[in-house]
C-alpha cells in the first residue's frame, strides 16, 4: 500500500496546542464546555485520489474506558486539507459519530433519543485525557471515488465498509495532548 505524509502543527515535543482540546481557553469550547474546535490537518496530494477520509483515534483511552476513543470521523473530503475549525465550518464534508454518543450499551435511551445523540455527536471532539498525557493517531485514506455513500449519522465501521476496495494510499501521523485539567 502506498503511503503519504500527514501534517498537523505541534510543538517541538509533539504536543497539540491546548486550544484544540479540553485544556482550551473558554472561547474555543462549545456552550457545553466541550472542545469542538478542530485543528488544521493537511497531507500530501495523492495522484489518482478523488477524495479522502480521516479518522482520529485515542488508543490510550483503553486504560480509562476499556476501548479506543473515536474523536473524529470524516468522509468525502474533496481536497488534501481540513482547515482549522473545519468540523464546525466546512459543510462539504460528512462527519461520523464520535465516542461521546450515548445509548450503545444498556441504555435507557429510546431509538429517537439515540438517533439525536448520534447526530449531536457527529463532530470533532478534542482530546481530554484524564489519566495523563495521551497519544493520538490520525489516519487519512486516499480514495479512488469522489464520494462515499454515507448518510448521517454513521459510525467508524460504516466508513470502513464504504471505503473497502477504494483505498489507494494511507497516511498516518501521531501527536500528544497533555492531561486534561478541569478548570
Regions found by a protein language model. Give the residues of each.
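N-terminus-centered regions that define maturation/targeting leaders and the start
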Residues: 1-183
Amino acid at each position: 500500500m502506498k503511503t503519504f505524509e500527514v501534517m498537523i502543527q505541534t510543538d517541538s515535543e509533539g504536543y497539540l496546542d491546548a486550544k484544540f482540546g479540553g485544556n482550551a481557553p473558554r472561547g474555543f469550547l462549545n456552550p457545553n464546555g466541550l472542545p469542538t474546535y478542530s485543528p488544521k490537518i493537511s497531507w500530501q496530494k495523492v495522484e489518482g485520489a478523488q477524495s479522502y477520509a480521516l479518522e482520529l483515534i485515542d488508543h490510550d483511552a483503553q486504560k480509562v474506558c476499556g476501548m479506543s476513543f473515536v474523536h473524529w470521523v470524516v468522509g468525502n473530503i474533496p481536497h488534501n486539507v481540513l482547515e482549522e475549525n473545519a468540523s464546525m465550518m466546512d459543510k462539504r464534508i460528512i462527519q461520523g459519530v464520535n465516542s461521546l454518543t450515548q445509548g450503545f450499551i444498556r441504555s435507557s435511551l429510546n431509538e429517537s433519543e439515540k438517533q439525536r445523540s448520534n447526530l449531536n455527536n457527529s463532530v470533532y471532539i478534542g482530546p481530554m485525557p484524564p489519566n495523563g498525557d495521551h497519544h493520538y493517531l490520525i489516519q487519512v485514506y486516499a480514495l479512488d471515488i469522489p464520494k462515499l455513500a454515507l448518510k448521517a449519522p454513521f459510525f467508524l465501521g460504516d466508513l470502513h465498509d464504504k471505503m473497502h476496495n477504494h483505498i489507494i494510499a494511507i497516511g498516518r501521523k501521531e501527536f500528544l495532548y497533555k492531561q486534561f485539567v478541569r478548570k
